[in-house]
Amino acid sequence: MESIKQKVPQIKICGITQDEEIQWLNEADVSYAGFVLYEKSCRYIPISKSQELFEKLNENIKKVAVAVNPDVTMVKQVMDAGFDILQVHGNLTEEVLAVTEIPVWRAVNLTDANIFEKLVREYRDLSIDEKITALLMDAKEFGSGKTFGWDAYERDEGKEMLRQLRQILEKEQIRFVLAGGLTPDNISRGIDIFSPDIVDVSSGVEKELGQGTGKDREKIQKFVRNMHSIV
């Protein structure tokens, strides 16, 4: 675990909807840009619009399609558009895994520590599909601006469950992504508790927290600056 803590987590900015936000991501030199393809989200944009935006991204920034219960048709559209990664919330079917030719980030929306404990049990001794390259831990409703109850993972029982999960992920060479309520002000605590490989922020760098009001350049810069100063 010590070797993990020494790594600087990569950054994903999620919920990109505007041209100016692309410029800010390029300036900040983040690793991933997320585009929400879920129509019920306040950050939703169609695949065609996402494509128009991400064509202006720096080449080193990976393009992540954020989907909820995607079907085979949608996955094919995502691949045709040129996305680099498929992030799946909700149901991930065998059919989707079979057809996808890009890496999959499996998102888990946590409501409490019991869900996390169940997750550890499911992943233990499980043969995980090689297309799943990351596990993303998020709050109950992604993009809500709320964390998933970090206090539980600062106690001994929570620390042990987290340790077990990290061991499983490392064995399977699956990256650990921390999402859900991250902000420039709490990123230090999040990294200290979870030692993630990647941090995923959306509402925490918006003009108004959790309102889908568009990103704020200064908050993006502060998030990146604060993260690098504590690792």
Residue spans for each PLM region:
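Conserved N-terminal beta1-alpha1 strand-loop-helix module at the mouth
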Residues: M1-V231
